[in-house]
Amino acid sequence: MRQKTLDVLEFEKIKSLVANETISDLGLEKVNQMMPATNFETVVFQMEETDEIAQIYNKHRLPSLSGLSKVSAFIHRADIGGVLNVSELNLIKRLIQVQNQFKTFYNQLVEEDEGVKYPILDDKMNQLPVLTDLFHQINETCDTYDLYDNASYELQGIRSKISSTNQRIRQNLDRIVKSQANQKKLSDAIVTVRNERNVIPVKAEYRQDFNGIVHDQSASGQTLYIEPSSVVEMNNQISRLRHDEAIEKERILTQLTGYVAADKDALLVAEQVMGQLDFLIAKARYSRSVKGTKPIFKEDRTVYLPKAYHPLLNRETVVANTIEFMEDIETVIITGPNTGGKTVTLKTLGLIIVMAQSGLLIPTLDGSQLSVFKNVYCDIGDEQSIEQSLSTFSSHMTNIVEILKHADKHSLVLFDELGAGTDPSEGAALAMSILDHVRKIGSLVMATTHYPELKAYSYNREGVMNASVEFDVDTLSPTYKLLMGVPGRSNAFDISKKLGLSLNIINKAKTMIGTDEKEINEMIESLERNYKRVETQRLELDRLVKEAEQVHDDLSKQYQQFQNYEKSLIEEAKEKANQKIKAATKEADDIIKDLRQLREQKGADVKEHELIDKKKRLDDHYEAKSIKQNVQKQKYDKIVAGDEVKVLSYGQKGEVLEIVNDEEAIVQMGIIKMKLPIEDLEKKQKEKVKPTKMVTRQNRQTIKTELDLRGYRYEDALIELDQYLDQAVLSNYEQVYIIHGKGTGALQKGVQQHLKKHKSVSDFRGGMPSEGGFGVTVATLK
């Protein structure tokens, strides 16, 4: 895409704002290289990449990338035999640390949110290499500034000797400086360092009283820095040890550099992936600042930008407009007052397309649609060249000639005030001829003009649409609202009336214009009113469609969760049934074994085929992974509303609330109300209640099978839960429902942790969608 176009559309300012959001020089480098792509697959992938990271960024706290830096130069130097210093090794260590933190974050993200997939980030995480050994080798050898003493046995020994020798030197020099006899001879009673040697400051007149080497003197010459002869040899020893230390440090750093060189390819991959992540996160941060949304890219030529606004203007004051090339429309001509926002509309369209093809979310409402353009050409603003002494018209025409040479059917062309700067009649004719030529090429065109002749241009040409920017005659100022499909109309009479011009003059002026022009203005005014009404209705329709899609997605997820839960329950029931049958079979085997032993010992009259028969009957009940429950329905009176029934498919008791028809009834099971087939219901005979059981049944009726904890404080909720569970156990309930609501999830977590430890609870689970979903926990009592 032409650099001139990007400059006119101020894309560099957008890049600068994205660059401000980067953390590392890796991310900054990628922002500086960011350019609009023109390949359809590349554009789509870049947008998916940014959108996926933006979703995660908007929902979760991402790991810090602080300290991430470009290390490829160090890696290449290590590969050719150079030796890295501690600072460079620490930057490599930080790269490994950052990538490991991101991998840990992603793994936790996947575990917590199993239903959501992030394929692009997943691919990047799979690319990240395992560099744990290299990290530990660097981390255990050096800190931010230097090698650890225990980096090697030799280094530890050398530094220990340096420390002990320094201590002896200090003790020796301390005795000298603290001696009463030397107090008047010293400039200061301290030990200092000159030329890496320990020295004492001696007044020049007492030089002869101290044997040793003079290493320095003060600016005035009154103080000499002398290394006493008593410590010269020890200082020499320190120098030798420092040399040995440097050699050992070089050896250790060479070894660490070798480890880096061995992992060079993996480190370069890690740098590339983490730099790309920094770049994408910067895009996500910027996108959130402009409330960017993801457009849908289409192979067919399409432009639909609902409520788009220019991202460099103040979002609080800028007017958002819907920009759309409707079906079969290739040219849009915008008319309206000067300073009414026509040029901003052109720049908004051009800049949003450049942003979208660079992988940036765009400042529009959800649902935008775009095609991919090979190039965007602009003739916007006054680009008059003083050096070339070109007029405004010549400057524009030079630019237009260049555009017409290169534009094709894959181009978007933006003309600002087409044909301006010359005689109006010639300018209008040129404008129409240029538009005809570009339409023949097949480019998509948006042009602004103030020529009234161009209002009629769309009426005798296919694929051309008028648009206008609105003017408020009450405030005598533009509203900056774009009206697609509505040509601009003259407001001269209304403005003159508002400013106080005599009605006689205005009415006479109206008689001087043709009837046709008057009717056209009235028609345009009617179009404006209808456009506003239709636009409001369409925005409301878009909102409702979006809400419906969201509800559909939520229901689909809940249905999938229900199916998974149902499947797990069935598998669990099968497993439990198999275990019971296995236990029964084993018990039967033991019984048969005992009977055989009894027959052998006692001579009991037990026939072998009878034993085998009984064993086979038990085996027939066992089904590997498929247990069928054959239920023989009891025949009682006809089921009516109010009857207590057993729901055969669920094995639960319930009460019939309503008979829907001959085949279906509505049944209440606990807190669940369901419509079920009558053939799935078995009428229960009412049992006579024994007097001795009255206490239990009375108690059972005093509490419900559900406990509502919504609105409770955490501690109060747990106290209430304990009391309720005690009563539920006394009432012989097998299952109860704890309603805690969704909220932040804190109360749900607390309730479930408490149930896990409670002595009366054997199991619990989250509620199914029909039971209240995530806002309910179902507890099974022992």
Curated annotation (Swiss-Prot):
Homodimer. Binds to stalled ribosomes, contacting rRNA. NCBIfam families: mutS2. This is Endonuclease MutS2. PANTHER family: OS10G0509000 PROTEIN, OS10G0509000 PROTEIN-RELATED. Its EC number is 3.1.-.-, 3.6.4.-. Residues 707-782 form the Smr domain. Gene3D superfamilies: 3.30.1370.110, P-loop containing nucleotide triphosphate hydrolases. It is an enzyme of class 3 (hydrolase). Keywords: ATP-binding, DNA-binding, Endonuclease, Hydrolase, Nuclease, Nucleotide-binding, RNA-binding, rRNA-binding. It comes from Staphylococcus aureus (strain MSSA476). Endonuclease that is involved in the suppression of homologous recombination and thus may have a key role in the control of bacterial genetic diversity. The gene is mutS2. Pfam families: MSSS, MutS_V, Smr. ATP binds at residues 336-343. GO terms for molecular function: ATP binding; ATP hydrolysis activity; ATP-dependent DNA damage sensor activity; endonuclease activity; mismatched DNA binding; ribosomal large subunit binding; rRNA binding. One of its GO terms (biological process) is mismatch repair. Belongs to the DNA mismatch repair MutS family. MutS2 subfamily. InterPro entries: DNA_mismatch_repair_MutS_C, DNA_mismatch_repair_MutS_core, DNA_mismatch_repair_MutS_sf, MSSS, MutS, MutS2, P-loop_NTPase, Smr_dom.
